[in-house]
């Protein structure tokens, strides 16, 4: 039958709206009647009179019909109003009846509630969260059981309440989480750190309530609580002066075991399904490995060797899946047994501890959890599938210059369980292994000119082995055995460490990529069931495929002149699972056939070779992985993995390239260069001069014949004589100029160029200004190859010097570099046009006496605001207030020198177009 839901207030509102519509229509009809019922003829002829009479008759007919429609409208609105009033009266009566029904139900339930604490009709109460309280039982005659409350930390969840004759059982409560383990204590000087405490076990999930005796499903079991976090390992003690090695960091605590899933409730004896069991709780995360102690600087040793960081704790095992509830009884509707819950996810392995001042290795990742066991099927029902294995923990991160930790192994798949009348359950897949930990970068400690050895990037950690697939369940009478689970894939090897090739350090090799993990073995197929009378036994299940091996790690980019690391070898393919045993013959039936063996997994691909540095040598490609072995009964060997890709050849043309920029004393920018393949030396980056000028005492290599001589000087009083040579300038990372003019000082007064630059520690001046006419024969930037000679971006805040086109957008560009024309304002005074030199090497700068309105020979007073605008005075370029240590010197000249201030406030790009003029862009 159909049902009608009515809201009396809505009907009353609709009737009111209809009344308003009727009024508007009546007014419109009255207005139309005046103009349409008595039309005047358009002319005095008979035709015009006939047309006017015809249309007037139409209008009168419309008015007659409108009166009838209005009457119907009024009747309809009145009907809606009456209906709303009647529904309102009925609602009042129904409310009284409902109240009476609740009172009657209370009277019915009172005796049983008093005698046995359970209503005759009604649902049971739910357990309070966090208490593990059991759910209340449902009504004896009719009602569902209440849900169990969740458990307190480490405690089980409450059991679901049972139903009566008719009703569903309540769900079991979730188990409480495990308590975290205590952290290990730090070691004494030279000693090892203490191990972290293990995490607590998660509480078990509550059991599901039973379904009604006559009808109803069993309640689902509660989920097991997650295991507690393992405690962090203690920090290793620092090395003693007598012995340079620091202590080993403590091992991280083992993560707590996840709680077991709750048992599903039993279904009704006649009609109903068994409850689904709860999943096992998640395993706790392994504790963080303790940091290795720093090496102590011993007598005659530059740097002590730090001990290895503590190993990360294993992830906790996942909780076992709960057992599925039994299904309906004999003669009733046969419900399926509950599926076995998945094993809890294995906790991630703790990261390896940080190595000491030398190069400690990262700890290994923890192992993954084990998958849950499949639930038992009821008579006639199918068996539950085995749970999947937990995923292996990731390998620990390595420190600078050390190897990455190995990935944890994947958990094994759960075993399927056969059932009466059903096929064997499928074994769970093995968990995927964790990836190998990433290694650190190559560590360098001393500048290259001293010729000390520099560390190489660490080797990537090996990927963890894949978990084995679960065995297939045994088939019952006349049914096939379950299929074995697939083996988990091996984890990928960690990437090799980067080689370093930065300023003030020798280039070194990139680390090798880690080997891929071995694929997990496939599960064995289940045994076939005994043949039924007159029938044949079931075939055994097929063995699971071996997991594919993990890929070898790819080696990373190395510095110029160094070799890229070799790609890691691919992991071996997992062996195929064994064939299942054929079923036993039934009476008169033929025995089942053994299943075919699965193919072995393919070997993983070798890792890519590392890219050589610019103009460097390319890396070696990695070897392919070994194919997995097939089984004796029909399996095929896996294919050999492909070789890794050949490392890239160093690039010779670039659009942009960057080198480090070091700021000395917060005011002097310094970069490192090498002339004609010599040692790397520091030079002052100076936009206020043109050409490279070097102190001869730091240059020992032969530059060839002298191509010119001259005499020049710098503001500050230094005058020098020089020889000019044609040679190459190397900025590192393969940034090598074409042969260009370099000025080498032969004599100077007063003192040497090195003494003149002693504040910055530089041994030369790299003048990059296009239009200032200062000493030198050419700018080094114009000798850069390709587009790198377009200009240079100076970004002191980021610590970089970038060659090539400007990569920043939205800047303000003015003509001239470094000499240009600007408008200057002193405090709130008027704007004054003045020539200016944007001089990165000018320290605090100078200002003309006429511009500052101050006598020459002194400094601008602290607290003076100097603002510099474009020459039209419309756009501010930069502004600052002077201090006692940052104020320009007042000179009698006519050109303002900005000093370092604008470069400290923002990135500035110097363009070499147009030639000999250039532009300056404030970004």
Swiss-Prot record:
GO terms for molecular function: aspartic-type endopeptidase activity; metal ion binding. Induction: Expression is induced in macrophages and infected mice. Highly up-regulated during the early stages of invasion of the human blood-brain barrier. GO terms for cellular component: cell surface. Residues 1-91 form the PE domain. It holds the Pfam family PE. The keyword Transmembrane helix does not apply. Residues 650-923 are annotated as: Aspartic proteinase-like domain. It is found in: Cell surface. A motif (D(T/S)G 1) lies at residues 686-688. Residues 121-170, 330-351, 427-561 are annotated as: Disordered. Residues 124-170, 427-440, 454-500, 510-553 have a biased composition (Gly residues). Keywords: Metal-binding, Zinc. A motif (D(T/S)G 2) lies at residues 839-841. The keyword Metal-binding applies. Zn(2+) binds at residues 686, 839. Disulfide bonds: none annotated. Contains an aspartic proteinase-like domain in the C-terminal region. However, the enzyme is inactive. A comparison of the structure with pepsins showed significant differences in the critical substrate binding residues and in the flap tyrosine conformation that could contribute to the lack of proteolytic activity of PE_PGRS16. Expression of this gene in M.smegmatis leads to increased levels of NO and IL-12 and poor survival of recombinant strains in macrophages. Contains a tightly bound zinc ion. The presence of this ion is unexpected, and two His residues from the hexahistidine tag on the expression vector contribute to the zinc binding site. Belongs to the mycobacterial PE family. PGRS subfamily. This is PE-PGRS family protein PE_PGRS16.
